[in-house]
């Protein structure tokens, strides 16, 4: 996986997420404090094209981490290349960090953009559920099967997040 184009694509998408955080930093009183950024976001400090662009790049970065369809392409190769313990940790813990980013960062800081993007996130999640489940049926390698089942089960998580109901 090291040096592969899939890994390179993941790094590029993560760089976009970094740009989103830098935009929030410079527009939000030069702070990375999540509570302060949430307060600024809910008070209307982040609006218009800026807010939409920041939500888009945060979405892109977190969606790769989830992994959300169609940004999941790195996952089967990562599971296959990883030792079994690494594959289990990837499926059990690390994939949840993207959804945590949505719940704790993107949605609270940019709630209006989250509402606007929720239908698209729900559609992509539903496609991911179906795609991941069907791809599981075609797998003969257990690690790839776990990877595609992770795409499906994280689709359910993201579908719940897209509903924007209080936790």
Task: Annotate each predicted stretch with a short phrase.
Residues 89, 122, 146-147:
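Hydrophobic/aromatic positions within or immediately flanking transmembrane alpha-helices
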Residues 1-7, 11:
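Single conserved hydrophobic/aromatic residue that forms the stacking wall/gate
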Residues 15-72, 77, 102-120, 163-167:
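Juxtamembrane/interfacial segments at transmembrane-helix boundaries in multi-pass membrane proteins
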Residues 47-52, 128, 146, 153-156:
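Aromatic-enriched alpha-helical transmembrane segments of multi-pass intramembrane proteins
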Residues 9, 13-20, 84-100, 150-163:
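Small-residue-rich segments of transmembrane alpha-helices in multi-pass membrane proteins
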Residues 56, 119-136:
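Transmembrane alpha-helical segments of multi-pass small-molecule transport proteins
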Residues 66-80, 130-149:
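C-terminal ends of transmembrane helices
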């Amino acid at each position: 996986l090291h040096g592969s184009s899939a890994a390179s694509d993941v790094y590029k998408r993560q760089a976009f997420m970094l740009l989103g955080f830098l935009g929030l930093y410079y527009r939000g009183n030069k702070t990375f404090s999540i509570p302060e950024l949430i307060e600024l976001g809910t008070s209307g400090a982040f609006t218009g094209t800026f807010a939409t662009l920041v939500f888009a790049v945060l979405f892109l970065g977190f969606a790769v981490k989830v992994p959300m369809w169609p940004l999941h392409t790195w996952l089967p190769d990562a599971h296959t290349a990883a030792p079994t313990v690494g594959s289990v940790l990837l499926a059990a813990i690390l994939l949840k960090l993207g959804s945590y980013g949505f719940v704790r960062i993107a949605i609270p800081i940019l709630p209006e953009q989250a509402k606007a993007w929720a239908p698209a996130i729900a559609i992509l999640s539903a496609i991911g559920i179906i795609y991941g489940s069907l791809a599981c049926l075609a797998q003969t390698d257990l690690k790839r099967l776990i990877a595609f089942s992770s795409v499906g089960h994280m689709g359910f998580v993201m579908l719940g997040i897209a509903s924007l109901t209080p936790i």
